[in-house]
Amino acid sequence: MFAWAGDIDQKGNDFLAVIDADPGSRTYGHLMATTVTDQQTGQVHHTEYTMPASGMLFANDHVAGRTFVFDVRDPLHPKVAVSFTEMAGYSHPHSFLRLPNGHVLASFQNAHAPGTGAPDAGMGISGGLVEIDDQGQLIRAASTADPKFADAMLMPYSLLPLPGIDRLVVTNSSMHDIDPIGHTYQIWSLSSLKLLRTEYLDTGGDQDGDVNPEEPRLGPDGSILVQTLNCGIERITGVATDHPRAKLVHMFPGSHCGVPTIVGHYLVQSVPIINGVVVLNLANPGKPAEVSRLELGEGLAPHWTGWDAKAERVVVTGIGDLHRLFMLKLDQKTGAITLDTAFHDADGKVGFNFDNRQWPDGWTGSANPHGVVFSR
């Protein structure tokens, strides 16, 4: 697997770490290689969620506003194929999803002020969607601005292409604390990249479960489940109709929940306040039920989760003082989630250590991992 990481002191550079994720290997959990970029760490952030068929992996440093395309077809020798910053007047991309044609559709958070080449004060309230090929070349782009929602925060955070019904669901939430709070999602025509409508999410009364919608995922019944920063799960139905509907169907404890993963009819959610993850049963998607949870220890605020269908494992990274990556086992029949204690670094401790180690490129220091992608 490939873990995108950066120096916690922001003095070293962003790098891609290759870790043995094969449970049958004698070096399961060990570092195999690293590829270092020329980018001093700002904030390593999202990679793609799953490995693309092309083996050309997008990974972003959000503060730097720079995205790298790694060629990982030779998994033990990844290399930077190309990098880019702004495109079509938009900057600071966040999420990267593949289209049926193999291109990436990326959510760029910020739009430049007309004619200035610089962001508006406060980074603006809208951004853009940009289609990009594996060579980092612009294909097409469209603004998320909606004159009917002129006062709303419409900075795209993530997106979910639905080619089977020619729709695209986009969530609006900012990475910048100075910007207004997001409460909306958008439905687009995927083929024409045309905005069809902007809609508000369900607040859930006084629960504020709609605050800053982030990650949309396709549920097992075809509805869209959206995780929010305020730890809500919103369920959107009717996206192919003129009357889509959002309903808050679950609230996790705390706030700042991160990247969820759906496996079959289970949703795995990182929940920082418990220093762990919670699993929901989606058999009744209108009323998900918790079936298990796992605490990973103080010092880790889990954020990213990802699924490896080959090894049947969930990977977890986070922020905080515990700079470790963990692998979890998910029972796909019961939803029970447990720590994979067989996954350990050369130090013998459970998990992969990013703290105060000497890396193959000669750098010694501590790193924060963020996005993690499994090889095919």
Please name every model-derived segment.
Residues 27-37, 79-86, 139-146, 195-202, ...:
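Beta-propeller fold detector
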Residues 72-163:
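Asp-box/WD-like beta-propeller blade repeats and closely related beta-sheet repeat scaffolds
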Residues 2-10, 106-126, 170-184, 319-332:
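Short, conserved, GDST-rich strand-edge loop motifs in beta-rich repeat architectures
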Residues 4-42, 47-82:
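Beta-propeller domains
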Residues 18-27, 69-78, 133-138, 187-196, ...:
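Short loop/turn segments immediately following beta-strands, especially the blade-tip
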Residues 38-52, 87-99, 149-167, 203-224, ...:
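Beta-rich, blade/repeat-based domains predominating
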